[in-house]
Amino acid sequence: MSIQRVSSKWTKTVVLQRSRTVNEYIPVTRQYDRQTLERMTELFELNYIKPDHGTYGNGVMRVKTVHTFSEPPTSDHSNAEEDITAESPLAESSSQDLETSSHQVTTYELQYGTKQEFYPTLDELHQALEERIQGHLYLIQQGIPLLKHEDLPFDLRVLTQKNLKNNWETTGILGRIAAPGKIITNIHGGGRLATFEELVLPHLQATGLQKLRSELYRLGIHTAVQLQKSFPRLKEIGIDIALDETGRPWILEVNTLPGIYAFGLLPDKEAYRRIKRYAIAYGRLPSKKKKTSRNAAKPQASSSKVKSRAR
């Protein structure tokens, strides 16, 4: 029986939101349109816009909403205002008048890759996004300000697999650090690998690190169990986890075809051997026996070709 894959981010999000336990970890996520863009930029300073179908961080964009206050226009009263001393009863009211005379200006910063663009209105931002979206389904998600390692944002990948007893088991956590100037941490986008301890320990004490590790291991299992209710042939998932500035974990995305070879680059080789053992058991990786039989068959096939040619 083949391993089930689910490519739609929106489909997976809807299923996960049905679990009260898992939903607490999911940032506000909606299907993209003009009205939703307006609402999300009002609610959150950062928002990420990403394709419903996509891998390796391709197509991900970030919108940052920037609020500033314009200076009040100068007038002939400026000299008179300079004569108002701090002790004057008019000083406080004059200061309040200056505040009310200024007005808030909102601009929008759009970033994709290392490129940044600025738009003075929401309509212009939406038009720029539509040109990149090109009619495809995109999602808009509340942006989580990531913890940083050496001034570079990072996130975590939690791997959960079916074990040899056909139960869900979280088998590994690795860290990914974004390349300078990038908004994504994906290795294909120039990010680099790190261990969970290397990234988290500077922000949390040892007891906090262990508590977070246990929480993520449980979250991996809860997430897999919830997804399996709708997709019964799932065998493995990779969860992209953001840690906000307080150390709170958030689920950014769940991948049903997670990369496993990156775990082999980490120091814990025993964990990697277990990951591969489970992947072989449920059919993700070929078994050693199959590899051996294939290799043995190749010389025989070539030998028969030689005989047929000789005839």
Q: In which residue ranges do the predicted regions lie?
A:
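A long amphipathic alpha-helix within ATP-dependent nucleotide-binding catalytic cores
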Residues: A128-L147, G181-A242
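Protein kinase-like catalytic core scaffold
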Residues: N47, E169, W250-L252
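C-terminal active-site "lid" helix and adjoining low-complexity regulatory extension at the edge
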Residues: M1-R5, L204, K211-S214, R218, ...
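A conserved helix-loop-beta module that forms one wall/lid of the active-site cleft
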Residues: M1-V66, E92
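A short catalytic or substrate-binding loop motif that flags glycine-/basic-rich loops and adjacent residues
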Residues: T41, H53-T55, H149-P153, R233
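Short, low-complexity Ser/Thr-rich regulatory SLiMs
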Residues: K64-T65, T160-L164, I241-E245
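Phosphate-binding site of ATP-dependent enzymes
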Residues: F44, P73-L193
